[in-house]
Amino acid sequence: MAYRILVVEDDEDIGDLLEESLTRAGYEVLRAKDGKRALQLVNDSLDLVILDIMMPGISGIETCQHIRKSSNVPILFLTARSSTLDKTEGLLAGGDDYMTKPFSEEELHARVIAQLRRYTIYQEKKEQEETFLIGGKLRVSEEFNEVWKEEKQIKLSDLEYRILKLLMNKRNKIFSAQNIYESVWGQPYFYCSNNTVMVHIRKLRSKIEDDPARPVYIKTEWGRGYRFGAS
């Protein structure tokens, strides 16, 4: 299967050149002319993003920061901005490499190959090391603190993740609010702590349930507590 590369470039001629060159090298190329469209195309099937900085609307720096909230896909900046400050800003925003225009196709291909090689090694290592908790459509990574629902990653806070992991590790066991608070927060339970747990359960349901009003994953056992309900 060919590697999939997203080219984010508002200049039509440069975008065409990149697409033609990368396609000729055997890659599958997707195109976006701005950051907004790029964010719509970013998903788990991408292997590399080639990203301009000066674009209409969302800049390449902002686009990179948004991508980094949910994805570790390699990002190669390709831009006319060539100062040391520009390069530093791009790398600190989450970029993995930085090239300036004008560029040679030979160097571009070398950098693409290097990024894809590193990413492939990272993915293989991650698959070997990673163990999951699975329930229904949910898949929870215990090593990387990641939660997936089918093929979509769900962003949880650290406390929400720890609540979900606690419940999934003991299927069908009922955890009282006190059990959850003392296990997750690691602090003595007080009466007002019940509201804290309820608020976080509600937020967690809003992110993982198809219908939070009729939860499938986080079940309430009235007067007793909560349990993970999906098999």
Curated annotation (Swiss-Prot):
Keyword flag Isomerase: no
InterPro entries recorded: CheY-like_superfamily, OmpR/PhoB-type_DNA-bd, Sig_transdc_resp-reg_C-effctor, Sig_transdc_resp-reg_receiver, WalR-like, WH-like_DNA-bd_sf
GO MF annotations in UniProt: phosphorelay response regulator activity; transcription cis-regulatory region binding
Keyword 4Fe-4S attributed: no
A GO CC term assigned to this protein in UniProt: cytosol
Major localization class: cytoplasm
Post-translational events: Phosphorylated by YrkQ.
Residues that bear 4-aspartylphosphate: 52
GO annotation (BP), single: regulation of DNA-templated transcription
Domain Response regulatory: residue ranges: 4-116
Function in brief: Member of the two-component regulatory system YrkQ/YrkP.
Name assigned to this protein: Uncharacterized transcriptional regulatory protein YrkP
Origin species: Bacillus subtilis (strain 168)
Gene that encodes it: yrkP
